[in-house]
């Protein structure tokens, strides 16, 4: 469901797809050929969420922002099932594994992989083509 929050209504490219049970709220921009799958919550109430082209946000994922940090997801990104992203940047061509959590001010460089169940703590910056896995990274 697309929902307005304050003066912001989500902008979804006409070639993107949103599952009927997904909640897409507020200041969100979703690019061409991207998809948001079942039971996802994308909530841009305090800052913007930007999703590039050909990106997929899989079932049960949660994407939020911080007052000081937008959440930016590049082109050709896969966000696997049950991922949580909060106020971070995921550059182009990345894979974020199932149940990973990525917190505020993190930058995942283009072409990187974050392993399933990983916890990436605030402020970490990873160069392109990184392999990131584990907890308290």
Residue ranges of each PLM-predicted region?
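Glycine-rich hexapeptide-repeat left-handed beta-helix
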Residues: 1-13, 45-61, 65-66, 70-75, ...
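Extended, small-residue-rich solenoid/repeat segments and analogous flexible loops
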Residues: 1-35, 39-41
């Amino acid at each position: 469901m697309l929902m307005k929050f304050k003066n912001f209504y989500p902008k979804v490219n006409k070639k993107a797809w949103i599952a009927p049970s997904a909640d897409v709220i507020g200041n969100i921009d979703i690019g061409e050929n991207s998809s948001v799958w079942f039971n996802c919550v994308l909530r841009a109430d305090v800052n913007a969420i930007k999703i590039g082209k050909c990106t997929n946000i899989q079932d049960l994922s949660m994407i939020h922002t911080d007052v000081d940090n937008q959440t930016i997801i590049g082109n050709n990104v896969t966000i696997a099932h049950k991922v949580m992203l909060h106020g971070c940047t995921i550059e182009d061509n990345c894979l974020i594994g199932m149940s990973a959590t990525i917190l505020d001010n993190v930058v995942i460089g283009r072409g990187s992989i974050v392993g399933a169940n990983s916890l990436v703590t605030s402020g970490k910056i990873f160069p392109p083509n990184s392999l990131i896995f584990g907890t308290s990274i």
